[in-house]
From Swiss-Prot:
Protein name (record): Cyclin-dependent kinase 18
Signal peptide boundaries: none
InterPro entries, sorted: CDK (IPR050108), Kinase-like_dom_sf (IPR011009), Prot_kinase_dom (IPR000719), Protein_kinase_ATP_BS (IPR017441), Ser/Thr_kinase_AS (IPR008271)
Pfam families per record: Pkinase
Region (Disordered): 39-61
Annotated tissue distribution: In brain, kidney, intestine and at a much lower level, in fetal tissues.
Length: 451
């Protein structure tokens, strides 16, 4: 239990003894009443002095505003169904705006609604299982929406896995349309459950269902969304470190979202030393393969290039089974690196030890003929040996390859979906096998979280 308290403290989730819901509601309603009294003492119009029609309209406006204000103050999803008794206690008909709730009041209120409780969610199907965690498809009793429940087993000797700590600590602060939303966090003595928004598929499954033959327009839309989410992370000094098609989730609308931040890191300076045992082998850059532990955001950009190629061709770019084979595949396509293409490479002991043949670079167009000239240029800019020379996610968003998407895609708010623009729609994939990713009606965004 002490370990769990320490874990919560690290995530800024622990507080002194929280106020009871009655105490927090009293505080909330007192703020309403004080403001109401102050308004009358200041000589402003009271409801009795207004005509019935004006009184009714005023009450309706105040009630609507109060409900919206409550959602904002508690950071609730827009489709939340608050218990009726909870709404009655808040006395939403009172006019005026209270000052913001304290952190303790907010958390007590959230707990009263049902957040942070296992009984709020119903497990439906088991989606997968790993060393530390099992993922279930579930349903929220609060919203009736589907959710993904990532149940992490807590070993009493070790406490919460560091990957879980990283994932929660990073995701609770990331609010972007192309990053999976963490809705809730539930802890017990035996497990830590992360409640995520549910998405129907991932990029690997999408490729499988379209026969590994994607419409090139869809490739562009998915690529832009990947870069949007990644640029948002990189601006906040966060490296994902495990980009691969399986970690790019896709819903029926076609929205692509970065997921699985278990290996992600918040970096303070570009040269900070990290483990080189990160990133699935096929998407691992050559500098990391050769043992480099000093890297920054370019570690993710090599993987982006590999994913672009895979979407365009339907097959992985460098499917090596060992580090040596992976390097061999890279060098055979891009040419064995030299001091000109990769300054300092000859001083890397691992590179000298492998003693690779001297391959000449091959034209990428011959391997990815469906990519146009701009697409090949973007791919080339991502697959550079010298990490600092790779194009950044922010710069890639402005690459001419995306010009056909229009200018408005660059003006969206972080939480706005690219599909909120009527000109952005997926097209039918040539190899379509029956998995529908149709564009549904545009409703309000549900990307809201309690964090």
């Amino acid at each position: 239990m002490n370990k769990m308290k320490n874990f919560k403290r690290r995530l800024s989730l622990s507080v002194p003894r929280p106020e009871t819901i009655e105490e927090s509601l009293t505080e909330f309603t007192e703020q309403f009443n004080q403001l109401h009294t102050q308004r009358n003492e200041d000589g402003r119009d009271e409801p009795g002095q207004l005509s019935p029609g004006v009184q009714y309209q005023q009450r309706q406006n105040q009630r609507r505003f109060s409900m919206e204000d409550l959602n904002k103050r508690l950071s609730l999803p827009m489709d939340i169904r608050l218990p009726q008794e909870f709404l009655q206690k808040l006395q939403l008909e009172n006019p005026g705006l209270p000052k913001p709730l304290t952190r303790m009041s907010r958390r007590a209120s959230l707990s009263d609604i049902g957040f942070g409780k296992l009984e709020t969610y119903v497990k439906l199907d088991k989606l997968g299982e790993g060393t530390y965690a099992t993922v279930f498809k579930g349903r929220s009793k609060l919203t009736e929406n589907l959710v993904a429940l990532k149940e992490i087993r807590l070993e009493h000797e070790e406490g919460a896995p560091c990957t879980a700590i990283r994932e929660v600590s990073l995701l609770k602060d990331l609010k972007h349309a192309n990053i999976v939303t963490l809705h809730d966090l539930i802890h017990t003595d035996r497990s830590l459950t992360l409640v995520f928004e549910y998405l129907d598929s991932d990029l690997k499954q999408y490729l499988d269902h379209c026969g590994n033959l994607m419409n090139m327009h869809n490739v562009k839309i998915f690529m832009f969304q990947l870069l949007r989410g990644l640029a948002y992370c990189h601006r906040r000094k966060i490296l994902h470190r495990d980009l691969k098609p399986q970690n790019l989730l896709i819903n029926e609308r076609g929205e692509l979202k970065l997921a699985d931040f278990g290996l992600a890191r918040a970096k303070s300076v570009p040269t900070k030393t990290y483990s080189n045992e990160v990133v699935t082998l096929w998407y691992r850059p050559p500098d990391v393969l050769l043992g480099s532990t000093e890297y920054s955001t370019p570690i993710d950009m090599w993987g982006v290039g590999c994913i672009l190629y895979e979407m365009a061709t339907g097959k992985p770019l460098f499917p090596g089974s060992t580090v040596k084979e992976e390097l061999h595949l890279i060098f055979r396509l891009l040419g064995t690196p030299t001091e000109e293409s990769w300054p300092g490479v000859t001083s890397i002991s691992e590179f000298r030890a492998y003693n690779f043949p001297r391959y000449l670079p091959q034209p990428l167009l011959s391997h990815a003929p469906r990519l146009d000239t701009e697409g090949i240029n973007l791919l080339t800019s991502l697959l550079l040996y010298e990490s600092k020379s790779r194009m950044s996610a922010e710069a890639a968003l402005s690459h001419p390859y995306f010009q056909s998407l229009g200018e408005r895609v660059h003006q969206l708010d972080d939480t706005a979906s690219i599909f909120s623009l009527k000109e952005i729609q997926l097209q039918k994939d040539p190899g379509y096998r029956g998995l529908a990713f149709q564009h549904p009606g545009r409703g309000k965004s549900r990307r809201q979280s309690i964090f």
